[in-house]
């Protein structure tokens, strides 16, 4: 694993070779397109490192990529492998200038010029080129998994975030998330600047952000904790049978409210160590700024991603409500 990481950090992945049954093309730095020489019935994007310090998904995807290189991992899907923010990965930082996962869908045009605004545009163009290639002989279904780890602890260690999406996701997609070991699935109800919202909104992909655990430095991740996710991804890209789920049933949530910080006087009334999915008491004032307060409603008590340190205009937390297993959007 250490050699794989070194190859990524020192621009040596381009020297990796693949079996003659796979056509490999680099669409940009850290953007690898793999097309089976035979026809394919699905196009899949696997992305990691959109936040540069989230190393476990990077190590896991490198293992999958090594299996493809050695011919040990079958590939029947058209596949785009994305290492999202390479300068931040090499620096061991979440980002250098802007949060890359807030800049997709053209939002990079309004951001301060820098590493992440350039990279968001480059990734958008690469995705467009990939789907154009995969549809050359007829349109095929599209899937995107963007793999992350979280800054704070969580009552649900592994969970999926689904972007706002007209209609519901397919039964096969929910089966993929369940087989991947997700403890919870959260459905967004508003558009956002994430990579997965971009691929879902612009290209109709079945997309999800997977949060796999805690942020750790390279070499300190226990990849056994992510074995279910790796097995499910391996089955996905090979059109194989999904591995059986060995956990308790998935819990489902829907975002009811976003807490948006609009000024520097914003305060978040939470313990800095509070875990994601903690249930807060009804009536509790969770956040305040000059013109607005946020109070917990009884039907949406669960907090996700609380962070008072975000820039003005960014999300400082989400309030969730428990949902039925079907997460269809309301009419």
List where the protein language model places each region.
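Structured catalytic-domain cores with a bias toward divalent-metal coordination
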Residues: 1-331
């Amino acid at each position: 694993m250490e050699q794989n990481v070194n190859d990524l950090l020192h621009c040596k992945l381009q020297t990796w070779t693949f079996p003659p049954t796979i056509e490999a093309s680099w669409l940009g730095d850290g953007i690898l397109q793999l097309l089976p020489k035979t026809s394919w019935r699905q196009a899949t994007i696997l992305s990691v490192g959109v936040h540069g310090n989230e190393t476990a998904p990077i190590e896991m995807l490198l293992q999958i990529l090594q299996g493809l290189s050695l011919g040990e991992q079958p590939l029947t899907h058209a596949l785009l492998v994305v290492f999202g923010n390479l300068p931040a990965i090499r620096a061991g930082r979440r980002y250098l200038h802007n949060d890359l996962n807030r800049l997709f869908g053209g939002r990079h045009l309004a951001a301060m010029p820098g590493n992440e605004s350039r990279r968001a545009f480059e990734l958008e163009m690469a995705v467009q080129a990939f789907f154009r290639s995969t549809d050359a002989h007829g349109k095929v279904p599209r899937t995107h998994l963007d793999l992350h780890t979280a800054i704070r602890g969580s009552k649900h260690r592994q969970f999926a975030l689904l972007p706002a999406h007209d209609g519901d996701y397919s039964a096969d997609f929910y089966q993929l998330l369940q087989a991947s070991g997700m403890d919870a699935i959260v459905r967004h109800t508003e558009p956002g600047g994430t990579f997965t919202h971009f691929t879902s909104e612009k290209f109709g992909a079945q997309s999800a952000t997977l949060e796999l655990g805690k942020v750790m430095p390279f070499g300190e991740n226990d990849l056994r904790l992510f074995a279910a996710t790796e097995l499910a991804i391996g089955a996905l890209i090979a059109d194989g049978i999904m591995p059986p789920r060995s956990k308790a049933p998935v819990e489902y949530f829907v975002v009811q409210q976003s807490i948006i910080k609009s000024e520097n006087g914003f305060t978040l009334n939470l313990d800095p160590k509070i875990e994601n999915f903690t249930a807060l008491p009804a009536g509790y004032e969770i956040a305040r700024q000059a013109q607005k307060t946020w109070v917990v409603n009884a039907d949406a008590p669960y907090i996700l991603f609380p962070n008072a340190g975000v820039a003005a205009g960014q999300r400082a937390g989400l309030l969730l409500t428990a949902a039925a297993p079907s997460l269809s959007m309301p009419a």
